[in-house]
Amino acid sequence: MNKFISKQSVAIWYALTALLATFIVGQVILWFFPDGSSMGTSLLFILMNLIPLIVAAVFSLVLREIKSLGAFFKKVFLQKESPLSWILAFFIPVIYYGISILLMNVRFTGNSLLAFFLYFPWTFLYGGLEEVGWRWFLQDHLSFSKHFIPKMMVLSIVWFLWHIPIYQLPWITAGSSNYLIFYLMILGNTFLFGALKEYSKGAVPCILAHMLIDSLAVLMLVQSSLLQIILLVSCEILISSWIVAIRKS
């Protein structure tokens, strides 16, 4: 990185660029493909989900943090991860859905396990790859505080704002119409994925955890009960903070 450019300024410009680019693509979809049924819609929607990764690659190259696009993908996808990071990648969905089940805030869809396996590959494009931007790039550049909780609070706000243009598309049903509940769910997952990133070098464990959470929604949906969501998020924050504290100790 250029020694005259701080990590904090990079984080700010990265967030603004990713948010603006996503908003613009979302508006193009609404203007030219409002019914959401054409090939153009699908391609642009994939592009929206890839913007965090694309902007991270561009920033990494421009700032000379990596020498080539090949080096970027190697650093993101081909790192040798610790066994603990893989364990956490599978444990995070257990935390999210397990606590929700204990709080009786889950509706089982009745779909078969086959539906999970069929949907799982799609979540690589529709969710998983955004982790390259948020966790691998932005979390690393949020250097305003050494403390985990303030960094996650800031990251959760950026991640929440990024989702808004996506969930304004008329055919998207994944987002809650209640923006408070929507933000709280984003907040909890920010802490879980953020804790996982503290243990991983690249982005693959975070991508896997994200894909598992999204894919399991085919089988069970976390409901929008405010009290249960607050309890869920509180547990996620406490568990994530404990996981990070163990690593630092």
Write out the residue ranges for each language-model feature.
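Specific transmembrane helices
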Residues: 2-127, 198, 221-249
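Alpha-helical transmembrane segments and their helix-entry boundary regions
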Residues: 10-14, 85-86, 137, 151-152, ...
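Membrane-interface helix/loop boundary segments of multi-pass membrane proteins
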Residues: 21, 129-156, 198-202
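Residue-level hotspots within the lipid-embedded alpha helices of multi-pass solute transporters
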Residues: 94, 123-128, 160, 182-187
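Small-polar-interrupted transmembrane alpha-helices in polytopic inner-membrane proteins
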Residues: 97, 151-164
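Juxtamembrane helix-entry segments on the extracytoplasmic side of multipass membrane proteins
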Residues: 108-120, 171-184
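Active-site His/Glu-centered metal-binding helix of metallohydrolases
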Residues: 128-133, 137, 161, 165, ...
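Functionally important transmembrane alpha-helices
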Residues: 177-235
